[in-house]
Amino acid sequence: MAGAFFAGLASDVLGSGLGSLINAGAGAINQKVEFENNRKLQQASFQFSSTLQQASFQHDKEMLQAQIEATQKLQQDLMKVKQAVLLEGGFSTADAARGAINAPMTKALDWSGTRYWAPDARVTTYNAGHFSTPQSLGALTGRTNSRVSAPARSSPSALSNAPTATSLHSNQTVSTRLGSSAGSGTGVSSLSSAARTRSWVEDQNRNLSPFMRGALNTSFVTPPSSRSSSQSTVSTVPKEILDSWTGAFNTRRQPLFAHIRKRGESRV
């Protein structure tokens, strides 16, 4: 009976030990399998996250590139439209290109101030345009000569006292211009060089008057506040016109500012 007891006890101990070994081996195998599964899952998750980030970065890069190209095209189209408008308004090609990018454009200075230079403009305004529209030869040929013909070469006093055919509106001057260009009409030798020079000066004085008739009836005008070394410069323009281009308020007629002159104001 004691043998049977010990035999049963030994079988129980052996079975328990064998079961423990089996359970330990199965647990180790399960842990290894679970570790491998977790490692593969983490690798797959990292790979997916990296791929997603690369795709997102590539998408953002393409979108930014598309926005840059669209912005550049829009800016180019706007500059082309602005340049076309400036060209249509009479500005030169160089000034239209400058104005399309808001760069400084060529300005003209006359007795009324500065304005943008648009030589091909149809109308002269305060902001843009040329000085005046030159008169056509067809309108000039119908006018009659209202002055006496020019004398021959003589002394300067005789030229200054005697009336000469210096008007641009005379038939003789027009025929002289036609003769020099087309080879017909009165030759250039019909007028003396002094008479032709005086005719050219009067032509400039007439065509360069922007807003006031006779505003530029001047000879070798020295600009206001200039330091010209020439002593023969003279201006026949009134002082109000000389000072009209200054942007500051004109205090010339106020007693308190009698001895004060703004920068650029004439002292004649």
UniProtKB/Swiss-Prot annotation:
Subcellular location as annotated: Virion; Host cytoplasm
Composition bias type Low complexity, residue spans: 145-163, 179-195
Keyword Acetylation annotated: no
Domain remark text: The N-terminus domain points away from the virion surface.
Other comment: Translated by a ribosomal termination-reinitiation process from the bicistronic mRNA coding for VP1 and VP2.
Region (Disordered) location: 132-199
Species the sequence originates in: Lordsdale virus (strain GII/Human/United Kingdom/Lordsdale/1993) (Human enteric calicivirus)
One CC-aspect GO term: viral capsid, decoration
The keyword Electron transport is annotated on this UniProt entry: no
Subunit structure: Homooligomer. The portal-like structure consists in 12 copies of VP2. Interacts with capsid protein VP1.
InterPro entries: VP2
Biased composition (Polar residues): 132-144, 164-178
Record protein name field: Minor capsid protein VP2
Family: Belongs to the norovirus VP2 family.
Sorted UniProt keywords: Capsid decoration protein, Capsid protein, Host cytoplasm, Virion
Task of the protein: Minor structural protein that forms a portal-like structure at a unique three-fold axis of symmetry, following binding to the host receptor. The channel formed by VP2 may allow the delivery of the viral genome through the host endosomal membrane.
Taxonomic superkingdom: Viruses
Pfam families from the UniProt entry: RNA_capsid
